[in-house]
C-alpha cells in the first residue's frame, strides 16, 4: 500500500513519486491550498494539495485529525524560506496527486494541543501510542532488546524459555495464582522470576543462559513498578562474581553507546556498608556531590540528649550533611525539610548555618549551638569541610532511620538546589550486602533471596553467626536507580538447607516447597551465578522518562488495573464452577 515511510523522506527523494500511508497529524486550510502534516511510526512529513488536482483538494477539505489516509504524490524540495529545521523532513514536502480516506475518526477523546491526564491516556492507549514521543520510546525499547540478543548471542549465551505456569515459592512478594481445572483445588503461580529454573538449567549443563522474560509480582505499586514486568535474565556456570559483573557491565556500556552515544566508562565498585555510610542508600545517585559525614564521636559528651543518646548507642548514628550554598535557605524551607525527614521516621532536623567561619560562634546561626561549645562546632565544620555560605543538616537516631532520612534528604536537596548534575551518567556496582536482615518479628529474612551464597563462610560458620554473613551479591545502580541485581548462588545442599533453616523453613516445608531443588543439588551441581536487569527500568533511563508506564505499550495503573480493557474483571460463574472456585463476599461490619 505504500512505497516509503513519511518520516524517512529526504532531499534524496526529490522528484520521486511516493505512496504514503498514515494519519493526519494536523490540517491547515488556506482555501486554494490545503496543507497536512502526515504521520506514521517513523515521523511526520508535510503534504499539500493544490487546485491543479481538484479531486484530491476537494477530498482533502474533509480531512480531520487522526483520519487514516493514503496519499500518492511527488517529493519536492522546499523553498529556502519555508525549510523547517525542527523537522527531520523539513527540507522537503509532498505534492499530492491522489488521496484515499481509509478510515475516518470520531471526535478525539485526547487533545494533542493540551496535556492529557494519565487516566485518559491509559484508557485510550491506542491513541496515546500514536504520539511521536511514545512511538519513539517503544522503538527504543525494541532496539534495546535487539542489541541485548545480539550481544548475548555473540558471548555464547543461549536463549532458553522457562515455564510461565509454575509452583509458588517464597520470593518476597505475593504470587499471582492460576487455578487448575484438571487438578481440583490446586493452583499454579505465575513466576516472580525464573530464578530456580535458570539455576536448574545450570545444573543441566547449559553454562550460559539468558531470556527476555515476563515476571509477575502482586505488590503495592509505585512509579517504577508494575504487576507484570520484563527482565533480561542471565545465569552462568563456572564464573566468579567479578567475571559476571565484567560481562554484564560490558552489555550495559554497549547499550548506552548504541542508544545514547555515551561511553559510561568503567563502573566503580562500592560495598553496601560504604554506600550506606556515605550516601544513606544502597543505590546512591553519584551525580549528587553531597555526602554524609559521621560526627557521633564529637558529640558523645554534649548535654543535648538528641545528639548524645544516639552518639553513645552502638545501634545509633549521628550524621551531618553539608549543603554547599545552603545558608541561603529560608526558615520556611528548613521547616519543610524538617517535615520531609519525618516521613522516614526522623523526629526533626537540626542544622548549622555557616555565615562566616572566621568569626567562630558569631559566624554561625543554629538552634543547637547553645548545646555545643566552640571547639565542637569547629571540629564539625572541619570534618565536613564547611565553607562560608554552607548549611549543615544533622540526623540523629538509630542507624536505619538516619540512613533513610538523610539519604532521602540528600536527594531532595540536591534536586531542589540544582546540585545534582542531571546531564551526567553515574553508574556503579554495589557489593557485599548483608546476607540477612531483621524481619521485625525476632527472626531473619533474606536480603536478596534464599538461594544467594554467603561470602567466604562454611555452612557451620553461617549457622553459628548468620547476622555476620555477607552475601556474595551485587547490584548495578545508574543515577540512583537499581537497574539490575544478582548473586553467586548456593550450589551445595548442606548450605542451602542451612539457609532455609536460618529463615525458619523447617525440613518438612523445605521438601514440600523446594524438594526438586534439593534433589538436583545432589548430582554434581556446578558453581553458578547470575543477574537480572529490569528491561522496563533500563528503557526508562535510556528514553529520559521518570515513569515506567511510558515505556510499556499497555501498562497497568498503580491499582494494577488496565483502564482500556477494564481488567481485572469478574469471571464467568460457569468458568468458576469448572475450577471448583466459589467467590465469598466478606461480611460487612456494622
Curated annotation (Swiss-Prot):
Residues binding ATP: 217-219, 226, 482, 534-537
Main localisation: cytoplasm
UniProt xrefs under CDD domains? AspRS_core, EcAspRS_like_N
Keywords, sorted A to Z? Aminoacyl-tRNA synthetase, ATP-binding, Cytoplasm, Ligase, Nucleotide-binding, Protein biosynthesis
Catalytic activity, EC? 6.1.1.12
- GO BP, sorted A to Z: aspartyl-tRNA aminoacylation
Looking up SUPFAM superfamilies in the UniProt record yields: Class II aaRS and biotin synthetases, GAD domain-like, Nucleic acid-binding proteins
UniProt-listed InterPro entries: Aa-tRNA-synt_II (IPR004364), aa-tRNA-synth_II (IPR006195), aa-tRNA-synth_II/BPL/LPL (IPR045864), Asp-tRNA-ligase_1 (IPR004524), Asp-tRNA-ligase_1_N (IPR047089), Asp/Asn-tRNA-synth_IIb (IPR002312), AspRS_core (IPR047090), GAD-like_sf (IPR004115)
What is this enzyme's class at the first EC digit? ligase
Q: Please provide, alphabetically and separated by semicolons, the GO molecular function terms listed in this UniProt record.
A: aspartate-tRNA ligase activity; ATP binding; nucleic acid binding
- GO CC terms, sorted: cytosol
Transmembrane portions of the chain: none
Region Aspartate, as annotated, extends over 195-198
Q: Which PANTHER family match?
A: ASPARTATE--TRNA LIGASE, MITOCHONDRIAL, ASPARTYL/LYSYL-TRNA SYNTHETASE
User: Which protein, by its recorded name, is this?
Assistant: Aspartate--tRNA ligase
The organism encoding this protein is: Escherichia coli (strain K12)
Q: What is the lineage of its organism?
A: Bacteria, Pseudomonadati, Pseudomonadota, Gammaproteobacteria, Enterobacterales
